[in-house]
Amino acid sequence: MFEKNLLNNKRILVSGGGSGLGKAMATRYLELGADIYICGRRKSVLDETAKELMDLHGGSVKSISCDIKVPEAIEDMVDEIWSEGPLTGLLNNAAGNFISRTEDLSPRAFTAISNIVFNGTFYMTNAIGKRWLNENLKGSIISILTTWVDSSGPYTVPSAMSKAGVNIMTKSLAAEWGHYGIRLNAIAPGPFPTKGAWERLSPGQDTDSNENDSFIPMRRNGEMKELRNLATFLMADGCDYLTGQTIAIDGASHLGSAGNFYQGLNKLSDDDWDGIRNMIKSSNDADKAKRSV
Protein backbone atom coordinates (compact mmCIF):
# COMPACT_ATOMS: atom_id res chain seq x y z
CA MET A 1 0.00 0.00 0.00
CA PHE A 2 2.87 2.39 0.81
CA GLU A 3 6.31 2.85 -0.71
CA LYS A 4 8.91 0.93 1.28
CA ASN A 5 10.92 4.02 2.26
CA LEU A 6 7.96 6.34 2.75
CA LEU A 7 9.11 7.47 6.21
CA ASN A 8 12.85 7.67 5.59
CA ASN A 9 14.41 10.56 7.54
CA LYS A 10 11.40 10.74 9.86
CA ARG A 11 12.00 10.65 13.61
CA ILE A 12 8.85 9.72 15.51
CA LEU A 13 8.08 9.45 19.23
CA VAL A 14 5.30 7.06 20.24
CA SER A 15 4.02 7.35 23.80
CA GLY A 16 2.78 4.08 25.23
CA GLY A 17 4.77 2.41 22.46
CA GLY A 18 5.77 -0.69 24.37
CA SER A 19 2.55 -2.63 23.83
CA GLY A 20 -0.88 -2.66 22.24
CA LEU A 21 -1.87 -0.08 19.66
CA GLY A 22 1.28 1.99 20.22
CA LYS A 23 3.54 -0.95 19.51
CA ALA A 24 1.57 -1.80 16.38
CA MET A 25 1.86 1.70 14.96
CA ALA A 26 5.52 2.07 15.95
CA THR A 27 6.21 -1.18 14.11
CA ARG A 28 4.68 0.13 10.91
CA TYR A 29 6.59 3.40 11.11
CA LEU A 30 9.81 1.43 11.57
CA GLU A 31 9.03 -0.84 8.62
CA LEU A 32 8.67 2.23 6.41
CA GLY A 33 12.04 3.69 7.36
CA ALA A 34 11.47 5.97 10.36
CA ASP A 35 13.71 6.17 13.41
CA ILE A 36 11.52 5.40 16.40
CA TYR A 37 11.46 6.43 20.03
CA ILE A 38 9.02 4.73 22.39
CA CYS A 39 8.25 5.92 25.89
CA GLY A 40 6.23 4.70 28.84
CA ARG A 41 6.53 3.78 32.49
CA ARG A 42 7.41 0.08 32.15
CA LYS A 43 11.09 0.18 31.17
CA SER A 44 11.45 -3.59 30.92
CA VAL A 45 8.51 -3.77 28.50
CA LEU A 46 9.90 -0.89 26.42
CA ASP A 47 13.35 -2.48 26.22
CA GLU A 48 11.87 -5.81 25.21
CA THR A 49 9.77 -4.18 22.50
CA ALA A 50 12.67 -2.14 21.13
CA LYS A 51 14.84 -5.25 20.85
CA GLU A 52 12.04 -7.29 19.29
CA LEU A 53 11.30 -4.68 16.64
CA MET A 54 14.93 -4.15 15.68
CA ASP A 55 15.55 -7.91 15.53
CA LEU A 56 12.60 -8.27 13.16
CA HIS A 57 12.91 -5.14 11.05
CA GLY A 58 16.32 -3.56 11.64
CA GLY A 59 16.43 0.20 11.92
CA SER A 60 16.53 2.18 15.14
CA VAL A 61 14.13 1.91 18.09
CA LYS A 62 15.13 3.60 21.34
CA SER A 63 13.21 3.18 24.58
CA ILE A 64 12.92 5.91 27.20
CA SER A 65 11.24 5.56 30.58
CA CYS A 66 8.98 8.56 31.10
CA ASP A 67 5.90 9.27 33.17
CA ILE A 68 3.96 11.69 30.98
CA LYS A 69 2.00 12.94 34.01
CA VAL A 70 5.20 14.76 35.04
CA PRO A 71 6.10 17.75 32.82
CA GLU A 72 9.71 17.78 34.00
CA ALA A 73 10.14 14.14 32.98
CA ILE A 74 8.86 14.99 29.51
CA GLU A 75 11.29 17.91 29.18
CA ASP A 76 14.19 15.64 30.17
CA MET A 77 13.10 13.07 27.59
CA VAL A 78 12.75 15.67 24.85
CA ASP A 79 16.22 17.03 25.69
CA GLU A 80 17.62 13.51 25.34
CA ILE A 81 15.92 12.95 21.99
CA TRP A 82 16.85 16.37 20.61
CA SER A 83 20.52 15.73 21.45
CA GLU A 84 20.39 13.25 18.57
CA GLY A 85 18.28 15.45 16.32
CA PRO A 86 14.77 16.93 16.26
CA LEU A 87 11.64 14.86 16.01
CA THR A 88 9.43 15.12 12.95
CA GLY A 89 6.39 13.43 14.47
CA LEU A 90 4.63 12.60 17.73
CA LEU A 91 2.02 9.91 18.29
CA ASN A 92 0.09 10.56 21.51
CA ASN A 93 -1.01 7.02 22.30
CA ALA A 94 -0.43 6.66 26.06
CA ALA A 95 -3.74 6.34 27.87
CA GLY A 96 -5.56 4.83 30.79
CA ASN A 97 -9.12 3.62 31.08
CA PHE A 98 -11.41 1.18 32.86
CA ILE A 99 -15.13 0.63 33.12
CA SER A 100 -16.95 1.73 36.26
CA ARG A 101 -20.22 3.21 37.36
CA THR A 102 -19.45 6.89 37.80
CA GLU A 103 -20.93 6.98 41.31
CA ASP A 104 -18.36 4.36 42.34
CA LEU A 105 -15.36 6.46 41.23
CA SER A 106 -13.08 8.00 43.84
CA PRO A 107 -11.26 11.29 43.14
CA ARG A 108 -8.05 9.28 42.95
CA ALA A 109 -9.51 6.97 40.30
CA PHE A 110 -10.68 9.95 38.26
CA THR A 111 -7.33 11.74 38.36
CA ALA A 112 -5.45 8.51 37.59
CA ILE A 113 -7.07 8.63 34.15
CA SER A 114 -7.32 12.38 33.55
CA ASN A 115 -3.69 12.99 34.52
CA ILE A 116 -2.54 10.63 31.77
CA VAL A 117 -5.04 11.23 29.00
CA PHE A 118 -5.79 14.94 29.43
CA ASN A 119 -2.76 16.44 31.19
CA GLY A 120 -0.14 14.08 29.81
CA THR A 121 -1.24 14.46 26.21
CA PHE A 122 -1.13 18.24 26.51
CA TYR A 123 2.29 18.20 28.21
CA MET A 124 3.71 16.02 25.42
CA THR A 125 2.15 18.08 22.65
CA ASN A 126 3.24 21.41 24.07
CA ALA A 127 6.79 20.33 24.91
CA ILE A 128 7.46 19.13 21.38
CA GLY A 129 5.40 21.82 19.66
CA LYS A 130 7.41 24.55 21.39
CA ARG A 131 10.65 23.01 20.12
CA TRP A 132 9.37 23.06 16.57
CA LEU A 133 8.18 26.65 16.93
CA ASN A 134 11.49 27.82 18.38
CA GLU A 135 13.47 26.10 15.62
CA ASN A 136 11.09 26.95 12.77
CA LEU A 137 10.45 23.26 12.05
CA LYS A 138 7.39 21.57 10.63
CA GLY A 139 5.91 18.53 12.35
CA SER A 140 2.95 16.19 12.62
CA ILE A 141 1.12 15.23 15.82
CA ILE A 142 -1.44 12.44 15.98
CA SER A 143 -3.50 11.74 19.10
CA ILE A 144 -5.42 8.51 19.66
CA LEU A 145 -8.97 9.26 20.82
CA THR A 146 -12.26 7.35 20.66
CA THR A 147 -15.51 7.90 18.84
CA TRP A 148 -17.08 8.83 22.20
CA VAL A 149 -15.83 12.39 21.74
CA ASP A 150 -18.78 12.93 19.39
CA SER A 151 -21.39 10.98 21.37
CA SER A 152 -20.97 9.90 25.00
CA GLY A 153 -18.89 7.64 27.20
CA PRO A 154 -21.11 6.08 29.86
CA TYR A 155 -19.18 3.97 32.37
CA THR A 156 -15.89 5.48 31.11
CA VAL A 157 -16.51 9.10 32.10
CA PRO A 158 -12.94 10.11 33.12
CA SER A 159 -11.52 8.91 29.82
CA ALA A 160 -14.42 10.26 27.76
CA MET A 161 -14.07 13.72 29.33
CA SER A 162 -10.30 13.70 28.88
CA LYS A 163 -10.36 12.55 25.28
CA ALA A 164 -12.99 15.16 24.45
CA GLY A 165 -10.53 17.72 25.78
CA VAL A 166 -7.76 16.33 23.58
CA ASN A 167 -10.13 16.48 20.63
CA ILE A 168 -10.67 20.22 21.08
CA MET A 169 -6.93 20.70 21.72
CA THR A 170 -6.27 19.06 18.36
CA LYS A 171 -8.62 21.40 16.55
CA SER A 172 -7.46 24.49 18.44
CA LEU A 173 -3.74 23.94 17.87
CA ALA A 174 -4.31 22.99 14.23
CA ALA A 175 -5.59 26.54 13.82
CA GLU A 176 -3.06 28.18 16.13
CA TRP A 177 0.02 26.44 14.73
CA GLY A 178 -1.11 25.88 11.15
CA HIS A 179 0.86 28.72 9.61
CA TYR A 180 4.04 27.26 11.10
CA GLY A 181 3.54 24.01 9.19
CA ILE A 182 2.65 22.01 12.32
CA ARG A 183 -0.26 19.65 11.71
CA LEU A 184 -2.44 18.04 14.38
CA ASN A 185 -4.92 15.27 13.69
CA ALA A 186 -6.53 12.52 15.73
CA ILE A 187 -7.66 8.95 15.17
CA ALA A 188 -10.78 7.62 16.88
CA PRO A 189 -10.50 3.81 16.82
CA GLY A 190 -13.42 1.52 17.46
CA PRO A 191 -12.90 -2.01 18.80
CA PHE A 192 -9.32 -3.06 18.08
CA PRO A 193 -8.86 -5.69 20.80
CA THR A 194 -5.61 -5.61 22.77
CA LYS A 195 -4.84 -7.45 25.98
CA GLY A 196 -4.42 -4.36 28.16
CA ALA A 197 -7.57 -2.62 26.95
CA TRP A 198 -9.76 -5.72 27.10
CA GLU A 199 -8.69 -6.51 30.68
CA ARG A 200 -10.05 -3.12 31.80
CA LEU A 201 -12.89 -2.48 29.37
CA SER A 202 -14.20 -6.00 28.72
CA PRO A 203 -12.88 -8.04 31.67
CA GLY A 204 -13.42 -11.74 31.29
CA GLN A 205 -13.88 -11.49 27.52
CA ASP A 206 -11.27 -12.92 25.16
CA THR A 207 -9.69 -10.54 22.64
CA ASP A 208 -10.85 -12.87 19.85
CA SER A 209 -14.46 -12.72 21.00
CA ASN A 210 -17.14 -11.65 18.54
CA GLU A 211 -19.62 -10.95 21.34
CA ASN A 212 -20.04 -7.27 20.44
CA ASP A 213 -20.20 -7.70 16.66
CA SER A 214 -23.96 -7.13 16.61
CA PHE A 215 -23.34 -3.49 17.61
CA ILE A 216 -20.91 -2.92 14.71
CA PRO A 217 -22.46 -2.38 11.27
CA MET A 218 -19.49 -4.12 9.60
CA ARG A 219 -19.99 -7.07 12.00
CA ARG A 220 -16.35 -7.44 13.02
CA ASN A 221 -13.58 -5.91 15.11
CA GLY A 222 -10.89 -3.80 13.50
CA GLU A 223 -7.70 -5.34 12.15
CA MET A 224 -4.47 -3.81 13.38
CA LYS A 225 -3.14 -3.31 9.86
CA GLU A 226 -6.07 -0.99 9.16
CA LEU A 227 -5.18 1.23 12.10
CA ARG A 228 -1.49 1.17 11.17
CA ASN A 229 -2.27 2.28 7.63
CA LEU A 230 -4.33 5.26 8.79
CA ALA A 231 -1.63 6.30 11.29
CA THR A 232 0.95 6.10 8.50
CA PHE A 233 -1.13 8.20 6.11
CA LEU A 234 -1.50 10.96 8.70
CA MET A 235 2.21 10.94 9.62
CA ALA A 236 3.59 10.88 6.07
CA ASP A 237 4.24 13.76 3.72
CA GLY A 238 1.74 14.25 0.95
CA CYS A 239 -1.35 15.32 2.89
CA ASP A 240 0.02 18.51 4.40
CA TYR A 241 -3.28 20.34 3.92
CA LEU A 242 -5.04 17.87 6.23
CA THR A 243 -5.08 19.17 9.78
CA GLY A 244 -7.48 19.58 12.69
CA GLN A 245 -9.37 16.39 11.84
CA THR A 246 -10.49 13.48 14.01
CA ILE A 247 -10.99 10.43 11.84
CA ALA A 248 -13.12 7.53 13.10
CA ILE A 249 -12.04 4.02 12.13
CA ASP A 250 -14.63 1.81 13.77
CA GLY A 251 -16.70 -0.01 11.16
CA ALA A 252 -19.38 2.66 11.65
CA SER A 253 -20.06 1.48 15.22
CA HIS A 254 -20.47 5.08 16.44
CA LEU A 255 -23.21 5.53 13.85
CA GLY A 256 -24.99 2.31 14.75
CA SER A 257 -24.77 2.40 18.56
CA ALA A 258 -22.84 5.54 19.62
CA GLY A 259 -19.73 3.35 19.85
CA ASN A 260 -19.77 3.16 23.64
CA PHE A 261 -20.35 0.60 26.39
CA TYR A 262 -23.92 1.43 27.37
CA GLN A 263 -25.65 -1.55 25.74
CA GLY A 264 -23.43 -4.09 27.45
CA LEU A 265 -23.24 -2.56 30.92
CA ASN A 266 -26.51 -0.82 31.76
CA LYS A 267 -28.15 -3.97 33.19
CA LEU A 268 -25.31 -5.25 35.38
CA SER A 269 -26.00 -5.95 39.06
CA ASP A 270 -23.98 -4.79 42.07
CA ASP A 271 -22.40 -8.24 42.25
CA ASP A 272 -21.44 -8.02 38.58
CA TRP A 273 -19.70 -4.71 39.20
CA ASP A 274 -17.88 -6.13 42.23
CA GLY A 275 -16.54 -8.92 40.04
CA ILE A 276 -15.45 -6.47 37.35
CA ARG A 277 -13.61 -4.31 39.89
CA ASN A 278 -11.73 -7.35 41.17
CA MET A 279 -10.67 -8.39 37.66
CA ILE A 280 -9.49 -4.87 36.82
CA LYS A 281 -7.58 -4.63 40.12
CA SER A 282 -5.78 -7.89 39.35
CA SER A 283 -4.76 -6.56 35.96
CA ASN A 284 -3.56 -3.26 37.45
CA ASP A 285 -1.55 -5.08 40.13
CA ALA A 286 0.16 -7.15 37.45
CA ASP A 287 1.09 -3.99 35.53
CA LYS A 288 2.48 -2.32 38.66
CA ALA A 289 4.66 -5.35 39.29
CA LYS A 290 6.13 -5.00 35.78
CA ARG A 291 6.89 -1.30 36.35
CA SER A 292 8.97 -2.20 39.41
CA VAL A 293 11.22 -4.53 37.39
Model-derived segments and spans:
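C-terminal helical subdomain
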Residues: 186, 206-242, 249-251, 276-293
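A glycine/serine/threonine-rich, flexible loop-to-helix segment
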Residues: 179, 191-216, 257-287
